A protein has these predicted regions:
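Phosphate-/nucleic-acid-contacting segments
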Residues: 15-18, 174-218
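Cyclic nucleotide-binding regulatory module and flanking cytosolic helices
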Residues: 16-57
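Short beta-strand segments in beta-sandwich/barrel cores
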Residues: 57, 84-88, 106, 130-131
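Short phosphate-coordinating micro-motif centered on Lys-Gly-acidic
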Residues: 67-72
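Glycine- and acidic-residue-biased ligand/ion/polar-headgroup-sensing regions
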Residues: 75, 79-85
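Cyclic-nucleotide recognition modules
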Residues: 96-155
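Basic, amphipathic alpha-helical hairpins
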Residues: 144-146, 164, 186-191
């Protein structure tokens, strides 16, 4: 090899190592975010965390990718490292959107996941999305082999139930404008990435009515 070849090869190696370092650092940061989220539910010791994290798989999905389809069994509990996700029921005329999930939240078709039966709704990505996922069988292993696994699982189930209850109470007690403001106050930046037709469906109005609401409050 010539001196020029040596230099080019050295630059290539340096670039490759830098890319590996950046990817490793990014993964480490994402895992730290997940551990913080879980510790807020219930503190997990290092031994349990290492066992749990060894079961996680990182997956990336393009925008508008179906994660769960009607009639299919949900096999994963996923933590959203990056992205926006929609839960909805397909209908002949209009889809019924009943949930949005964002970064640092869990997503799963939970009823299908725990009962091992077909899902009655669908889940899709609204943006390019990164998930940390654990399968049903691997989660059962975590429950069986760690001290804190079962308690964390119960707390996560309670958290999902509270989110569902909050949504139902909102539909019964709040106006469409109040529901929109609630969603806007939660994630104002990410809300811009959700098509208005899905937001309209979520708060229970037509797209035209949503446009009027947006004009009134801006």
């Amino acid at each position: 090899m010539t001196g020029q070849d040596d230099l080019e090869y050295a630059i290539y190696l340096l670039t490759f190592v830098q890319e590996l370092y950046c990817k490793a650092y990014k993964c480490l940061h994402q895992m730290e975010e997940l551990r913080k989220f879980i510790n807020d539910i219930y503190p997990m010791n290092d031994v349990d965390w290492n066992f749990f994290s060894s079961k996680l798989e990182k997956e990336t999905f393009k925008k508008n990718t179906a994660l769960v389809k009607i009639g299919r069994v949900e096999n994963y509990l996923s933590f959203i490292s990056k992205g926006v996700i929609r839960l909805y029921i397909p209908q002949e005329e209009n889809e019924l959107t009943f949930g949005f999930l964002f970064e640092n939240q869990f997503v799963t078709a939970y009823d299908s996941f725990i009962t091992r039966t077909a899902s009655d709704y669908e889940i899709e990505t609204l943006t390019d999305t990164t998930l940390w996922r654990i399968s049903f069988d691997q989660l059962q292993e975590v429950y069986n082999k760690t001290e804190s696994g079962n308690l964390i699982g119960r707390r996560m189930a309670e958290n999902m139930f509270l989110i569902k209850s909050k949504r139902e109470v909102s539909l019964l007690n709040k106006t469409a404008e109040e529901r929109y403001l609630d969603l806007f106050s939660e994630r104002p930046r990410l809300l811009k990435e959700i098509p208005l037709k899905y937001i309209a469906s979520y708060i229970g109005v037509t797209p035209q009515a949503l446009s009027r609401i947006r004009r009134r409050i801006t």
